[in-house]
Amino acid sequence: MVSVFTYIARMPRVFCDRDEKAGKEFPMRELKTTEAVGKTLCQDITQIIKGEKKGPVFRKGHVIREEDVPVLLSVGKDHIYIWEEGEDTLHENDAAAMLYEMGRSENMHPSEVKEGKIEFIADCDGMLKIQSEKLFALNSFGQMMMATKKNHSFIKKGEAFAGTRIIPLSIEREKMEEVKKIAPEGGILQLLPFEKKKVGLISTGNEVFYKRIQDSFTPVVREKLSPYPVEVIGHVTCPDDVEQEKGAIQDFLRQGADLVICMGGMSVDPDDRTPLAIRLSTEEVVSYGAPVLPGSMFMLAYAKGKVPVLGLPGSIMFCPTTVFDLVLPRIMAGDIVKKEEIDALGEGGLL
């Protein structure tokens, strides 16, 4: 893991003007821009040109020159802050570094500090897992923030999946030491690498088995698996027969499959046998049914050795985003899914 302090070791510190609640003066001064030549900027100065640019025109630590004054005035900075050192406060860069340390774990590194913000960058493809209570506690602490992609998201290598900063230009050192107690060892955010998995695919239904219709389900599932490190070790088609479906599941498990996916036959129709076949082939049924549309007839079970066996309803092949897309990153990262976590998908589950 790369420590963010590597990136800011040479950066000078900046401090807030005043903490209104505490009534404390911080060693930072406001000056007219026209009087600030030779002084040091205590914050990045952002320039926004519609359709062209949004970014710092001057960085923290820049010593203002005579020719810089018109540029500062053009971006609306008639007054600026200059800094002086202090012992009881932390510059926003240093505070952001501390927040990053609270969030970080393996498989990630910090971005360069920019405008007081540090981003979390993925070192590999993986699934983001968040300690939500700790994240909430941090964001409730006041004067600081950490924003993330959604929990259990698919994250690509090189992607920024979170960002953190304090809100003011500086903050009391004591307050930052206090917030560190939420996660003294870090780890609010985890990036679980995707595991290489052997996958068995089972198509079900008389209409497919007897070739009355073309199988349009399997290509969709293969496409959804394609971003992950998988090896499809086989694909079989079964009629609507419990024993044949159960036998196909067990055959794949004996072959060492790390994941078995059953496609179709998941409704309450009299011909649909897949839920029973999954029950008879596994040790634990987590859920038959999920509060998600499309995909409410989804089934998740675990066979011996915590091998997931999925039952996918027909809506998976027609809709671009379904319950399968919500659960698949967790399955591929080896993250065990619990019933209460399936139940919680109802909030935001209308896709």
Residue ranges and their predicted role:
Residues 7, 17-19:
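Intrinsic-disorder-associated, low-complexity terminal segments enriched in Asp/Asn/His/Tyr and depleted
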Residues 34-38, 56, 110-113, 153-155, ...:
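Solvent-exposed alpha-helices and their adjacent loops that cap or buttress functional pockets
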Residues 206, 233-351:
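Short glycine/threonine-rich loop/turn motifs
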Residues 186-240:
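Glycine-rich phosphate/diphosphate-binding loop of Rossmann-like nucleotide-binding domains
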Residues 86-194:
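Extended, charged alpha/beta regions that create polyanion-binding interfaces
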